[in-house]
Amino acid sequence: IFLSALRDMFKNTPKRQCIVFTGPPNTGKSYFVFSLINFLQGKVVSFMNAKSHFWLQPLADTKFGFLDDATDACWTFIDTYMRNGLDGTPVCLDSKHRNPIQIRLPALFITSNVDVDKETKYSYLHSRLKVFHFHKKMPLDGHGNPLYPITDANWNSFFTKLEKQLDICRSPESDNGESERPFRCCAGEPAGTL
């Protein structure tokens, strides 16, 4: 199910561009997504800056965004103002020292302690979000570090092994068998017409 959600996200499928990880505190949601967003070279936005008109500005310059720890107030904001953005339709984004720009929001990862998919007041968001639940505490070693660290090398291996299932492209190999550039995650070419 996670692979299907990622594939839809990478292909910019309408209403399939937001993956949410919910669960109680200390289950590793943020750790998991921070490692992924770091690998994908995405940008992080924070709802604590929501009083500023420009808090979503970093999303204008990236293919992947991350909103950590969405509270009930944040979900209310998303439900009120960001539904069209989650649908994949163009929205107007206000940027500091620039004119407002019209963009499609990038693929968005959100972590939350709120089970948004079970809240009836957010029923209009249910079709726009793919929710995964983290129920178990994240295992830590004696020093408080993750027992199973997630690194860029882990993500590289994940995407390399599952590139076919995720329908992602890799740069063509050069004559000596080496890639011409590092692995980059992007949607594959659309299928040809019949």
Question: Residue locations for each model-derived region?
Answer:
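Sparse, context-dependent recognition of short Cys/His-centered cofactor- or disulfide-binding micro-motifs
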Residues: 4, 44, 50, 67, ...
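Active-site/pore-lining binding-face segments in mid-to-C-terminal subdomains
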Residues: 57-64, 72-75
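Walker B catalytic acidic pair
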Residues: 23, 68-70
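Single, functionally critical "micro-switch" positions that shape active/binding sites
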Residues: 28-29, 67, 99
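P-loop NTPase catalytic core of nucleic-acid-dependent motor ATPases
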Residues: 1-60, 178-193
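Alpha-helix boundary/capping detector
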Residues: 32-33, 62, 108-111
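Structural motif
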Residues: 20, 64-66, 109
